[in-house]
Design a protein with these regions (language model features):
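Periodic small-residue-enriched repeat registers in elongated scaffold domains
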Residues: 1-77, 81
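C-terminal intramolecular chaperone/autoprocessing and neck/assembly modules of extracellular spikes
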Residues: 55-56, 61-159, 163
Length: 168
């Protein structure tokens, strides 16, 4: 393993390189060649996994990626994962991980969705040419009282509201 960048870290593993300033490389054949890179390489291949632009978070994990926020993979847990070979996150939604199930009034949900302001917008931190569409979190929270914060919309809540509105 090679450690060359100022304030860079290679905590262990094998065949790792952290040459960017403030970079991190761990696992196997991880190369953090640009400033601010974090790279984790699994042991699935001898080929390196590289960070090719500054300030990126790069992980090679052909066995999948699991982010658990409670429990463990063998029992009731909360979290998200990307299955091996998959392209998208899957949120835990197992009935056995839930409690206090309550029925909803799909027609009421539909009425609220129809009244929910929807706009196109861009993030202040993005190029203005990149557009998105959706409700503002504060409006969504006021209408449905779902999730952890009135400043965010969980995709699992947005999906549930959309499916309920379709049923309505």
């Amino acid at each position: 393993s090679v450690l060359c960048g100022l304030a860079s870290t290679v905590p262990g593993g094998s065949n790792n390189r952290a040459t960017g300033v403030g970079s991190f490389a761990a696992g196997f054949a991880a190369e953090a060649n640009f400033d601010g890179c974090f790279v984790w390489g699994d042991f699935s291949t001898d080929s390196p996994v590289r960070c090719n632009l500054a300030n990126r978070f790069v992980v090679r994990s052909v066995g999948g990626i699991y982010m658990l926020t409670s429990g463990n993979q063998e029992s009731n847990y909360a979290g998200t994962f990307i299955a091996p070979g998959a392209q998208a996150w899957t949120a835990t939604s197992d009935r056995n991980s839930k409690e206090r199930l309550q029925p909803i009034d799909a027609e009421d949900v539909l009425r609220k969705v129809v009244q929910l302001p929807i706009a196109t917008w861009n993030w202040k931190s993005q190029d203005p040419a990149i557009r998105h569409m959706g409700p503002m979190a504060q409006d969504f929270s006021a209408a449905f009282q779902l999730g952890e914060t009135p400043k965010g919309i969980s995709t699992i809540d947005a999906d549930g509201v959309a499916l309920a509105a379709i049923q309505g």
